[in-house]
Amino acid sequence: MASKFFEIHGVLPPVITPFTKEGKVDFEAFRKNIEKWNDTGVAGYLVLGSNGETPYLEEEDKLELIRIAAQHKAPGKLLMAGTGLENTQATIRLTQKAAEAGA
């Protein structure tokens, strides 16, 4: 059986979540940020880290950010997504959805 583990190496910066003046997630600005990071030497990206606004986002916004990062990251770049929530079952569900979205 093949191992499901892989070696993580290099720099994986936390990617900020930009907002519009109206307080909505700015998905277009987020996409542009991912594309700018593609031109750097980073090994990948950490989306929805634990030190930002993640706890205050709607689940669908979180999943859309993951989908955008997955669709626009350069080939070979790793995508990690924060999925920790207040209880275990909710964390498991969000983690499964994040994997389906490309993380």
Kindly give the residue locations of the regions a language model identified.
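Active-site beta->alpha loop and helix N-cap motifs at the rims of alpha/beta catalytic domains
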Residues: 2-13, 17-103
